[in-house]
Swiss-Prot record:
Annotated source species: Mycobacterium tuberculosis (strain ATCC 25618 / H37Rv)
Alphabetical list of PANTHER family matching this protein: SARCALUMENIN, TRANSMEMBRANE GTPASE FZO
Protein name: Isoniazid-induced protein IniC
Induction: Specifically induced by a broad range of inhibitors of cell wall biosynthesis, including antibiotics that inhibit the synthesis of peptidoglycan (ampicillin), arabinogalactam (ethambutol), mycolic acids (isoniazid, ethionamide) and fatty acids (5-chloropyrazinamide). Down-regulated by the nucleoid-associated protein Lsr2.
Domain of life of the source: Bacteria
Pfam families, per the entry: Dynamin_N
Cross-referenced InterPro entries: Dynamin_N, P-loop_NTPase, TRAFAC_Dynamin-like_GTPase
Cellular component GO terms, alphabetical: cytosol; plasma membrane
């Protein structure tokens, strides 16, 4: 029986217990809450994007979805928690504090905007945006107000979502955008990280060095500078045991790459073919690039539009890519997307979140159910908790995620090669057998033997007499991961 099936069984037994309790059998609200907990198992993974004001969250949402669906201007919509879900047709719904739901008019002025003139934002809980994007089929993305916003209410909305007072998790994972490693960000990350270690809240946290092209002042090598910054962030956050990775991303370049227009490609190709001295002079600064008296072969108005869409870094990168031999808009878009860092971020999200989505959702459901039966006690409450706690404590996929988070910040008796191998075997590079064993996916015949060898190796390493308790725990986690693969291969025979 899978973990999700076990959660459903516990939930079914819990519902029966409440139906048998005189105080609750007529409480429709109680059964609605239990139904919602169960429904989470069938829903897409919930991933929240968080960070300080102007960190680039909405732009990154747009880049991940591949469309301008999250308002990026300083409107009321950016001060409200917004849920982006898959739907057959575009629709925006406002959820009011009293339970009322209202449709919100959608406008298009360069990008999506929500008309909230007839709605008091202070009365809203959140907004729900349904959009027919393939990227939203398997993941619901939650855009949050800046945590250091001058509007206290906006910041509090985000805190209520990420660090709920009732301990019931609203999301399954968090992508946290960082421009600097300031005290406010570290404090919030520690709170979320504390929830991870305490077996409640989101089990997965990924950091993003956002607006990465601005770290290097828009220079052609800006992403290299951003990569160095991301490594420093990773090192410092790892030492605190807060998150496993920080990825540098230029959300603006990623969004532009995913929505590149043929007219923009033609204009960039003209610029790339301009006289080299004049072009280099124009690319020195924003003012030079948009000067009306510039001899560049592209109208100043179009250059201003390119600047808004690409930024100076994106324009410089596009011209360099075209000069290197790319000949069509598809090739340019692919190169820009790769260089934006979005591909690397999506790979990390896939490894840490998507490949473990069932386990993350099961964890959220278990924590929510445990909190619910404590808040609404019935005679069966101790028995429900007795069923839940072993799953939260012992389910191996949860332990893998915790170990991946804890390993960088804890001292062990393992050497660097052993730590790298252990991270890989517990799923740090992906959850497929090939990824865990470091094998070519095409060479599947070696996998059963490699899994058995890994189980034997880590069993011996777990029994080493000089191990400290944490090292032994880590090695035992590797043993269980390897043994699970051995069992899976045996079942296929």
């Amino acid at each position: 029986m899978s973990t999700s099936d076990r959660v459903r069984a516990i939930l079914h037994a819990t519902i029966q217990a409440y139906r048998g309790a005189p105080a609750y059998r007529q409480r429709g609200d109680v059964f609605c809450q239990l139904d919602r907990i169960g429904a989470r198992l069938a829903e897409p993974l919930r991933i929240a994007l968080a960070g300080t004001l102007k960190a680039g969250k909405s732009t990154l949402v747009n880049a991940l979805v591949g469309d301008d669906i999250a308002p990026t201007d300083a409107t009321e919509a950016t001060r409200i928690v917004t849920w982006f879900r898959h739907g057959p047709t575009p629709r925006v719904t406002a959820n009011h504090r009293g339970g009322r739901r209202a449709n919100v008019p959608i406008t298009r002025r360069g990008g999506l905007s929500f008309d909230l003139r007839r709605i008091n934002p202070a009365e809203l809980i959140d907004l729900e945006v349904e959009w027919p994007a393939e990227e939203l089929i398997d993941a619901t993305i939650v855009d949050t107000p800046g945590t250091s916003s001058l509007a206290c209410d906006a910041s509090e909305r985000t805190l209520r979502l990420l660090v709920p007072a009732d301990g019931v998790p609203r999301v399954d994972a968090v992508v946290f955008l960082l421009r600097t490693l300031n005290a406010a960000d570290v404090a919030l990350l520690k709170q979320i990280g504390g929830l991870v270690g305490g077996s409640v809240g989101a089990l997965g946290i990924i950091g993003v060095a956002s607006r990465a092209d601005e770290i290097g002042a828009g220079r052609i090598d800006a992403m290299l500078s951003a990569n160095d910054v991301a490594k420093r962030f990773t090192r410092e956050l790892n030492q605190m045991g807060i998150c496993q990775a920080v990825v540098p991303v230029s959300g603006l370049l990623a969004l532009t790459a995913r929505t590149l227009r043929q007219t923009e490609f033609i204009a960039l190709r003209k610029l790339a073919g301009a006289e080299r001295t004049e072009l280099n002079r124009a690319l020195l600064s924003v003012d030079r690039f948009v000067r009306r008296d510039s001899p560049l072969p592209v109208d100043a108005g179009i250059r201003a539009q390119l600047l808004e869409r690409f930024g100076m870094f994106g324009i410089r990168m596009s011209i360099a890519v075209l000069a290197a031999g790319v000949t069509d808009s598809t090739g340019l878009a692919a190169e820009l997307l790769e260089r934006s860092g979005l591909v690397a971020l999506r790979n990390v999200i896939d490894q840490q979140f998507a490949q473990r989505s069932d386990m993350l959702k099961a964890h959220t459901a278990l924590v929510s159910l445990r909190r619910f039966v404590q808040t609404h006690p019935v005679p069966a409450t101790p028995y429900v908790i007795a069923d839940i706690d072993p799953l939260l404590a012992d389910t191996h996929a949860f332990e893998e995620l915790r170990m991946l988070s804890l390993l960088p910040s804890r001292a062990t008796t393992l050497n660097d090669d052993e730590i790298a191998s252990l991270r890989r075997i517990i799923g740090g590079s992906g959850t497929s057998a090939a990824a865990r064993l470091g094998l070519d996916p095409a060479n599947s015949r070696e996998a059963p033997r490699a899994a058995l060898a890994a189980a034997q190796h880590w069993r011996r390493r777990a029994a080493h007499p000089l191990n400290d308790p944490f090292t032994t725990r880590a090695c035992r986690a590797a043993v269980r991961s390897a043994e699970a693969m051995v069992a899976e291969f045996s079942a296929r025979r």
